[in-house]
A protein has these predicted regions:
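Conserved GNAT acetyl-CoA-binding A-motif
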Residues: 110-122
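A conserved beta-turn-beta hairpin within the catalytic core of GNAT-like acetyltransferases
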Residues: 73-84, 94, 140-141
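A short helix-loop-beta-strand connector motif used in the catalytic cores of GNAT acetyltransferases and
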Residues: 46-57, 83, 139
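Conserved acetyl-CoA-binding loop-helix of GNAT-fold acetyltransferases
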Residues: 89, 95-108, 135
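Conserved beta-strand in the GNAT
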Residues: 57, 63-72
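Conserved N-terminal entry element of GNAT/NAT acetyltransferase domains
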Residues: 1-20
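Conserved active-site alpha-helix within GNAT-family acetyltransferase domains
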Residues: 100, 124-143, 147
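Conserved GNAT-fold acetyl-CoA-binding loop/helix
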Residues: 18-46
Length: 149
């Protein structure tokens, strides 16, 4: 990496895409985590944004090297919180500070928004990601249960 990692917000708080070029450039890295995303990636993300999600990307040397999708909401248990739907760094650039840069940005944003908690889920098979989250001071606080409908 020649230039420092910078974080670019893709959409605003109303869900409007403000960086269409970066949204398109995010797709290959995002698919490293979510291979099942549909071919109409931009339309899918617009629907996700319409439901309150935000997206930012980590950029270096004019390339997207990391993606985060997140949302701020309030519930009865944690109050106002940030929930991270997706967090992925380019598999060819792992352990280069990308995940930490994204997490730092997200946590700063969460604090600025008055969030009391920062949450994410990570698949049970993602042991490397779990080690990263533990190193970053995160702890397992619950089990997430799911059932296909």
């Amino acid at each position: 990496m020649n230039e420092p990692i910078r974080i670019v917000e893709i959409n605003d708080a109303n869900g409007n895409v403000i960086e269409t070029g970066w949204l398109a450039a995010a797709e290959p890295v995002h698919r490293q985590l979510r291979a099942h995303l549909p071919a109409d990636y931009a339309q899918k993300m617009q629907r996700v944004f319409g439901d309150g999600a935000r997206m930012c990307v980590a950029v270096c040397d004019r390339r997207v090297i990391g993606v985060a999708v997140y949302r701020i909401h309030e519930n009865t248990f944690d109050g106002v919180q940030m929930y991270v739907d997706d967090l992925v760094s380019d598999e060819t650039r792992r352990s280069q500070g990308i995940g930490r840069a994204l997490l730092d940005h997200l946590q700063r944003s969460a604090r600025a928004a008055g969030c009391a908690k920062f949450n994410l889920d990570s698949g049970t098979q993602r042991q490397q990601a779990h080690r990263f989250y533990f190193r970053e001071g995160m702890v397992v606080t619950s089990f997430h249960f799911a059932k296909p409908l």
